[in-house]
């Protein structure tokens, strides 16, 4: 593993050898869970994760996948920066979750962030299959079939309901 990944996650080559799962086995197990679809995949910066998932599941049979990108939601809720670590702080979750870049910690952190977002405003469903992207840089990677991509600039804080990305899309 590259040193930056070891530094970020604490996962070493030795640990991968003793505790890791072979990619083909992981792909088969994940595909089995998703075969009947639809499956809602949730990620912070889902476009990034979707590229990895697409590669992992290449050749596997899966049902429809819907996407909820918490980064798109968060950009309508808070000012820059927009990392998951920033959302953990913004929603006062630092004593409850960790941002360790380890799968289980990140899943638990994202779950708590989404609960806080839903408590703040019950509109998460309107963000399903809607990804905002920075108009300065465009969409990174291949676009996901079924996802609508819209330019989304930075906000200065909690956006009024009528100014959120989903509300602007509906008005068009």
Predicted segment positions?
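Conserved beta-strand -> loop -> alpha-helix junction used to position metal-binding or nucleic-acid-contacting
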Residues: 62-74
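Generic alpha-helical structural context detector
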Residues: 72-75, 86-89, 112-115
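Catalytic phosphate/metal-binding cores of nucleic-acid and nucleotide-processing enzymes, i.e., regions
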Residues: 75, 80-82, 144-146
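Hydrophobic side chains within alpha-helical segments
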Residues: 52, 72, 108-109
